[in-house]
Amino acid sequence: MLILIVGYVIYSVVTKAGAIENAKSVLSYPQAILGMTAIFVYVGVEVTIGSNLGEYLKETEGLDASQISKFVSLFWGSMMIGRWTASISNFNPSESLKKILIVVVPFVAFSVVLIANSLYSGDVTDLLPYSAYIGVMILAYFASKEKPVRLLLIFTALGAIMTIIGVMTTGKIALFALISGGLFCSVLWPSIFSLGTAGLGKFTNQGAAFLIMMILGGSIIPVVQGKLSDSFGIQQSYLLAAACFAYLFIFGIIVQGVLRKQGIDFDKEVVKGGGKGH
C-alpha cells in the first residue's frame, strides 16, 4: 500500500511538472509536494535508525544497557559530526582553509564524542575504527561540491549502501555501517528544504510550514520498522531504512527535473550565489 501511495504521488507530480501559472495554493507546486514526502521520509529514517539501534545491539551483539549507550551516542554524535562539517561555509573561510577544515572538523567532533563517552562508559577504543566511515563522509562532502542536489544524491546513495551493508554483514562492520546512517542523514534537511521551497514565490512561507508539518514521519516510520522487526528480525528490518534513503535519492532526481521545467537549475543558482546551498 505504501509503495502504491508513493507511486501515485510521483506520477501526479511528474504529470504536472511544467511551469506553473496562476497557482492558487502551495500544493499547485510539485516541488512542494515532493518536499513534503521527502521531509516525512528523512525525519523517519533519521529517527528509526537511532531509536531501534538499542534493540539491534541486544539481539545481534548480546550487549546490555551499559554497553549499548556508547553506540547509540555515536549515532547521534554522527549527526553532530556531519552538521559541524556542513556549517564550515557559514564562517566564510578562504577556499584553502575551508578544505583543511572539512578534513579536520569532523575528527574534532568525533573526538568530542569519544571524550563524552569515555567519561560515561570508560574504554572507547572499540569506537576508533569508525573513523574510516568519517573518512568516507569527508570524501563524499568534497565530491558534492556543496551543491544541494549533488550532495543529496551522493549522501542518500551512500546511506542506502551503508544500510544494506549493515543488513548483509555481521559484527562491527554491520554495526558501524548502520551507525554511519547518522553521518549521511546529517546534512540532508537543508538540501531537501531548499529544494522543496524553491520557486514557490509568495507561497514560500506556506510551503515551509507544510514541510515542517511532515516531521511526523519520525513518529510513524520507527513504528513500521518495529512491526517489520517482529516479523523478520531486527537486522532485516533495517532494509526499511535503506528504502527510505533510496526514496530520497529518487526525490533528488525527480525534483531537479521538476525545477528545471520551471526554469530553475538549482545547483547552478547556488554556484552563482556563492556556493552556499545549505
Which residues make up each language-model segment?
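C-terminal transmembrane helical hairpin of 12-TM major facilitator-type secondary transporters
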Residues: 97-192
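A late C-terminal transmembrane helix in Major Facilitator Superfamily
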Residues: 167, 183, 197-232
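Symmetry-related core transmembrane helices of the 12-TM Major Facilitator Superfamily/SLC fold
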Residues: 1-9, 104, 235-256
